[in-house]
Regions:
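Surface-exposed, low-hydrophobicity beta-strand/loop segments enriched in small/polar/acidic residues
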Residues: 1-222
Protein backbone atom coordinates (compact mmCIF):
# COMPACT_ATOMS: atom_id res chain seq x y z
CA UNK A 1 0.00 0.00 0.00
CA UNK A 2 1.22 3.49 -0.80
CA UNK A 3 -0.01 6.45 1.25
CA UNK A 4 -1.04 9.24 -1.12
CA UNK A 5 -2.99 11.88 0.82
CA UNK A 6 -5.37 12.49 3.70
CA UNK A 7 -9.14 12.58 3.41
CA UNK A 8 -9.15 16.34 3.95
CA UNK A 9 -7.08 16.82 0.79
CA UNK A 10 -3.70 17.61 2.34
CA UNK A 11 -0.80 15.63 0.89
CA UNK A 12 1.55 15.85 3.87
CA UNK A 13 1.79 12.31 5.23
CA UNK A 14 2.43 12.03 8.97
CA UNK A 15 4.38 9.12 10.44
CA UNK A 16 4.96 8.44 14.12
CA UNK A 17 7.04 5.91 16.01
CA UNK A 18 5.35 2.96 17.70
CA UNK A 19 6.72 0.04 19.71
CA UNK A 20 7.52 -3.14 17.78
CA UNK A 21 9.08 -6.44 18.86
CA UNK A 22 12.67 -6.65 17.68
CA UNK A 23 12.07 -9.90 15.76
CA UNK A 24 8.83 -8.84 14.04
CA UNK A 25 9.20 -8.61 10.26
CA UNK A 26 7.31 -5.73 8.64
CA UNK A 27 7.83 -4.08 5.26
CA UNK A 28 7.18 -0.49 4.25
CA UNK A 29 3.70 -0.26 2.75
CA UNK A 30 2.28 -3.07 4.86
CA UNK A 31 -1.06 -2.57 6.62
CA UNK A 32 -0.41 -2.87 10.35
CA UNK A 33 -2.33 -3.09 13.60
CA UNK A 34 -1.57 -2.98 17.31
CA UNK A 35 -1.49 -6.21 19.27
CA UNK A 36 -0.39 -6.27 22.88
CA UNK A 37 0.65 -2.65 22.51
CA UNK A 38 3.05 -3.37 19.65
CA UNK A 39 2.87 -3.09 15.87
CA UNK A 40 2.24 -6.30 13.93
CA UNK A 41 1.13 -6.99 10.35
CA UNK A 42 -2.60 -6.93 9.66
CA UNK A 43 -4.35 -10.22 8.96
CA UNK A 44 -5.70 -11.18 5.55
CA UNK A 45 -9.22 -11.07 6.99
CA UNK A 46 -8.62 -7.97 9.11
CA UNK A 47 -11.79 -7.03 10.99
CA UNK A 48 -10.17 -5.33 13.99
CA UNK A 49 -9.09 -1.70 13.70
CA UNK A 50 -5.90 -1.00 11.80
CA UNK A 51 -3.23 1.48 12.90
CA UNK A 52 -2.13 2.50 9.43
CA UNK A 53 0.59 1.80 6.88
CA UNK A 54 4.16 0.94 7.84
CA UNK A 55 6.45 3.81 6.89
CA UNK A 56 9.70 1.85 6.89
CA UNK A 57 11.13 -1.66 6.67
CA UNK A 58 11.71 -3.60 9.88
CA UNK A 59 13.21 -6.95 8.89
CA UNK A 60 13.48 -8.24 12.44
CA UNK A 61 17.13 -9.20 11.91
CA UNK A 62 20.32 -7.27 12.57
CA UNK A 63 21.51 -5.10 9.68
CA UNK A 64 24.76 -3.19 10.05
CA UNK A 65 23.52 -0.63 7.51
CA UNK A 66 20.17 -0.11 9.23
CA UNK A 67 20.16 -0.15 13.03
CA UNK A 68 16.36 0.19 13.01
CA UNK A 69 15.94 -3.12 11.16
CA UNK A 70 15.66 -4.94 14.48
CA UNK A 71 15.00 -1.96 16.69
CA UNK A 72 12.16 -1.57 19.15
CA UNK A 73 10.32 1.18 17.22
CA UNK A 74 8.83 1.52 13.74
CA UNK A 75 7.37 4.46 11.83
CA UNK A 76 3.68 4.15 10.94
CA UNK A 77 1.58 6.50 8.80
CA UNK A 78 -1.27 6.60 11.29
CA UNK A 79 -3.74 9.30 10.26
CA UNK A 80 -7.27 7.83 10.55
CA UNK A 81 -8.17 9.69 7.34
CA UNK A 82 -5.15 8.42 5.40
CA UNK A 83 -5.91 7.42 1.81
CA UNK A 84 -3.65 4.72 0.44
CA UNK A 85 -3.52 2.86 -2.86
CA UNK A 86 -2.56 -0.51 -4.26
CA UNK A 87 -2.55 -2.20 -7.68
CA UNK A 88 -6.00 -3.26 -8.85
CA UNK A 89 -6.62 -7.02 -8.53
CA UNK A 90 -7.24 -9.02 -11.69
CA UNK A 91 -9.39 -12.00 -12.62
CA UNK A 92 -9.65 -14.26 -15.66
CA UNK A 93 -12.86 -15.37 -17.28
CA UNK A 94 -13.79 -19.04 -17.44
CA UNK A 95 -16.87 -18.37 -19.55
CA UNK A 96 -19.48 -15.73 -20.17
CA UNK A 97 -22.17 -14.23 -22.33
CA UNK A 98 -23.04 -10.77 -23.58
CA UNK A 99 -24.28 -9.94 -20.08
CA UNK A 100 -22.46 -12.33 -17.71
CA UNK A 101 -19.00 -13.44 -16.70
CA UNK A 102 -18.00 -16.50 -14.70
CA UNK A 103 -14.49 -16.07 -13.26
CA UNK A 104 -11.91 -18.84 -13.39
CA UNK A 105 -11.94 -21.13 -10.36
CA UNK A 106 -10.42 -19.44 -7.32
CA UNK A 107 -10.33 -15.96 -8.85
CA UNK A 108 -13.38 -14.83 -6.86
CA UNK A 109 -14.03 -15.70 -3.22
CA UNK A 110 -16.40 -18.67 -3.23
CA UNK A 111 -17.76 -17.57 0.14
CA UNK A 112 -18.73 -14.07 -0.98
CA UNK A 113 -22.44 -13.46 -0.44
CA UNK A 114 -24.99 -12.71 -3.12
CA UNK A 115 -24.66 -9.08 -4.28
CA UNK A 116 -21.21 -8.75 -2.65
CA UNK A 117 -19.70 -7.39 -5.86
CA UNK A 118 -22.63 -5.33 -7.10
CA UNK A 119 -21.49 -1.96 -8.50
CA UNK A 120 -17.92 -3.17 -9.05
CA UNK A 121 -16.33 -2.27 -12.37
CA UNK A 122 -14.50 -4.69 -14.66
CA UNK A 123 -11.98 -3.33 -17.16
CA UNK A 124 -10.79 -5.62 -19.94
CA UNK A 125 -7.01 -5.83 -19.59
CA UNK A 126 -6.13 -8.40 -22.25
CA UNK A 127 -7.78 -11.02 -24.42
CA UNK A 128 -6.77 -14.66 -24.65
CA UNK A 129 -5.41 -15.99 -27.93
CA UNK A 130 -8.34 -16.72 -30.20
CA UNK A 131 -10.81 -14.76 -28.06
CA UNK A 132 -13.89 -13.61 -29.97
CA UNK A 133 -14.73 -10.99 -27.33
CA UNK A 134 -15.80 -7.87 -29.25
CA UNK A 135 -14.83 -5.54 -26.41
CA UNK A 136 -11.55 -3.69 -26.78
CA UNK A 137 -8.91 -3.62 -24.02
CA UNK A 138 -9.80 -0.77 -21.67
CA UNK A 139 -13.56 -1.32 -22.00
CA UNK A 140 -15.30 -0.77 -18.66
CA UNK A 141 -18.36 -2.76 -17.64
CA UNK A 142 -20.23 -2.33 -14.37
CA UNK A 143 -21.36 -5.34 -12.35
CA UNK A 144 -25.12 -5.12 -11.90
CA UNK A 145 -25.56 -8.33 -9.90
CA UNK A 146 -23.51 -11.08 -8.29
CA UNK A 147 -24.82 -14.59 -7.59
CA UNK A 148 -22.85 -16.74 -5.16
CA UNK A 149 -24.20 -19.90 -6.77
CA UNK A 150 -21.89 -20.42 -9.72
CA UNK A 151 -19.98 -17.19 -8.96
CA UNK A 152 -21.82 -15.40 -11.75
CA UNK A 153 -21.21 -11.71 -12.37
CA UNK A 154 -23.98 -9.99 -14.32
CA UNK A 155 -22.57 -7.12 -16.36
CA UNK A 156 -23.72 -4.27 -18.48
CA UNK A 157 -24.31 -5.70 -21.95
CA UNK A 158 -21.22 -5.91 -24.13
CA UNK A 159 -18.84 -8.40 -25.69
CA UNK A 160 -18.85 -12.07 -24.68
CA UNK A 161 -15.91 -12.88 -22.38
CA UNK A 162 -13.82 -15.81 -23.57
CA UNK A 163 -11.96 -18.25 -21.36
CA UNK A 164 -8.66 -16.64 -20.39
CA UNK A 165 -9.67 -13.03 -21.00
CA UNK A 166 -8.16 -10.96 -18.19
CA UNK A 167 -10.03 -8.20 -16.38
CA UNK A 168 -9.06 -5.62 -13.80
CA UNK A 169 -11.51 -5.83 -10.92
CA UNK A 170 -12.35 -2.51 -9.25
CA UNK A 171 -14.45 -3.15 -6.09
CA UNK A 172 -17.53 -1.03 -5.57
CA UNK A 173 -16.85 2.36 -4.03
CA UNK A 174 -17.61 2.22 -0.33
CA UNK A 175 -17.30 -1.55 -0.15
CA UNK A 176 -15.18 -3.55 2.27
CA UNK A 177 -15.61 -7.03 0.81
CA UNK A 178 -12.06 -7.93 -0.23
CA UNK A 179 -9.19 -9.48 1.71
CA UNK A 180 -5.59 -8.41 2.12
CA UNK A 181 -2.93 -10.40 0.32
CA UNK A 182 -0.54 -12.53 2.43
CA UNK A 183 1.87 -9.59 2.79
CA UNK A 184 -0.95 -7.16 3.72
CA UNK A 185 0.19 -4.81 0.97
CA UNK A 186 -2.79 -4.99 -1.42
CA UNK A 187 -6.41 -6.05 -1.70
CA UNK A 188 -7.47 -9.27 -3.44
CA UNK A 189 -10.89 -10.49 -4.60
CA UNK A 190 -9.99 -14.17 -4.30
CA UNK A 191 -10.91 -13.98 -0.60
CA UNK A 192 -13.05 -11.84 1.68
CA UNK A 193 -12.92 -10.60 5.25
CA UNK A 194 -10.81 -7.43 5.44
CA UNK A 195 -13.74 -5.39 6.73
CA UNK A 196 -11.32 -2.85 8.25
CA UNK A 197 -10.23 -1.63 4.78
CA UNK A 198 -12.68 0.15 2.47
CA UNK A 199 -12.34 0.90 -1.25
CA UNK A 200 -13.04 4.57 -1.97
CA UNK A 201 -11.50 5.29 -5.35
CA UNK A 202 -10.69 3.94 -8.82
CA UNK A 203 -7.75 5.19 -10.86
CA UNK A 204 -8.24 3.61 -14.27
CA UNK A 205 -5.22 5.35 -15.81
CA UNK A 206 -2.79 4.18 -13.14
CA UNK A 207 -4.54 0.82 -12.60
CA UNK A 208 -4.87 1.29 -8.85
CA UNK A 209 -7.58 1.36 -6.23
CA UNK A 210 -7.70 3.80 -3.35
CA UNK A 211 -8.55 2.71 0.16
CA UNK A 212 -9.17 4.09 3.62
CA UNK A 213 -9.53 2.53 7.07
CA UNK A 214 -13.08 1.45 7.83
CA UNK A 215 -11.95 0.83 11.42
CA UNK A 216 -8.96 2.71 12.84
CA UNK A 217 -7.28 2.53 16.24
CA UNK A 218 -7.05 6.32 16.57
CA UNK A 219 -10.51 7.15 15.27
CA UNK A 220 -12.83 8.86 17.74
CA UNK A 221 -15.44 6.53 19.19
CA UNK A 222 -18.84 7.61 20.42
Amino acid sequence: MRPIQNAGGEETIRARSYPVAKATAITAGQVVQLSGGKVVPAAAAQTAAILGIAGEDHSGTADILNPRADGDEILVCDNPGLIFECPVPTIRAASGSAATLVPASGNIAAGAADDAYNAAVLVLKSKAAGSSNSDKPGTRRAVTDYAKSGTVLTLETGGTPAAGDEYEFYPALGSAVCALNPKATALVVSATGAAAVRCIGHDYERHTIRCIAAAHTLAAKS
